[in-house]
């Protein structure tokens, strides 16, 4: 197993990045079932813990995290790197010579994710992530965000051949 902790962005990573709005203003997001299986079953069965950090706030995200048994999810966080430093203290994480937290993986898709990505030993990106994020990634999924990219990253981290 390459990482003990997997931190995930939501919009554009766990979803396709689109927000669907109903007539009454209700928001909808779609999540991939394969990503859910990777988060709920595969990664924890290999001894890993999944954490969600997202800049937006949504009851939808809270519901999905609860459904997948993600105990640590943080919404409305614009400075994700700062949140990682807080988590590093909580979990007593160590850094390598490059200043990256050991045994920590992050997957994100847009420029807001770059500062936290640079702090993680393993950095994943969906195929359709922004150009800048793709440059920082150590793993680029063959799948788009919201279409199994997270599952593919989890399989990579767990050493599962696909």
Predicted segment positions?
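Alpha-helical substrate-recognition element adjacent to the catalytic core
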Residues: 1-78
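Mg2+-dependent phosphoryl-transfer enzymes with acidic/Ser/Thr/Gly-rich catalytic loops
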Residues: 28-29, 67, 81-162
């Amino acid at each position: 197993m390459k990482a003990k902790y997997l931190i995930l962005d939501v919009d554009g990573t766990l979803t396709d990045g689109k927000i669907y709005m109903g007539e009454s203003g209700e928001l909808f997001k779609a999540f991939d079932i394969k990503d859910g299986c990777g988060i709920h079953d595969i990664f924890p069965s290999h001894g890993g813990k999944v954490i969600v950090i997202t800049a937006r706030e949504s009851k939808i995200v809270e519901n999905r995290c609860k459904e997948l048994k993600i105990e640590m999810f943080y919404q409305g966080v614009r400075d994700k790197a700062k949140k990682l430093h807080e988590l590093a203290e909580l979990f007593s994480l160590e850094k390598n010579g490059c200043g990256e937290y050991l045994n920590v993986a992050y997957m994100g898709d847009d420029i807001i994710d770059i500062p936290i990505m640079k702090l993680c030993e393993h950095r994943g990106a969906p195929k359709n992530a922004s150009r800048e994020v793709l440059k920082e990634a150590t793993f680029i999924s063959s799948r788009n965000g919201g279409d199994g990219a997270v599952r593919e990253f989890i399989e990579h981290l767990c050493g599962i051949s696909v």
